[in-house]
Amino acid sequence: MANQETDLQQRIRLTVGALPGFRAWRNNSGKLPDPRTGRWVQFGVASPGGSDLIGYRTIEITPDMVGRKVAVFTALEIKTATGRATPEQRRFIDHIRAAGGISAIVRTTADALRIATEPFRGI
């Protein structure tokens, strides 16, 4: 049986990835031993604690905001209805938000669509 969180993550990635101006990629993360040295090597963006999906949402800046488009870094941490974020994941979410990005815990495709389409107020 497939992992529920993995299935949810795939549905969310495909759903928000189909929206205009929104791109999301799976952030594979973890650690493995280097076969040459035996040292553990971490991989993934902001590992440990990096969100499951990372990407950007293109925001059109209104004329009073100079009139340019910018890509806003977006990190979605996928959790099932009962899943809990680790302290490292919470810190990463807080860091992205503090830096002006979009980051959230997402439990459904509806959550992801809301985050991907609601007016951006981060600037």
Predicted segments — roles?
Residues 1-123:
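Catalytic phosphate/metal-binding cores of nucleic-acid and nucleotide-processing enzymes, i.e., regions
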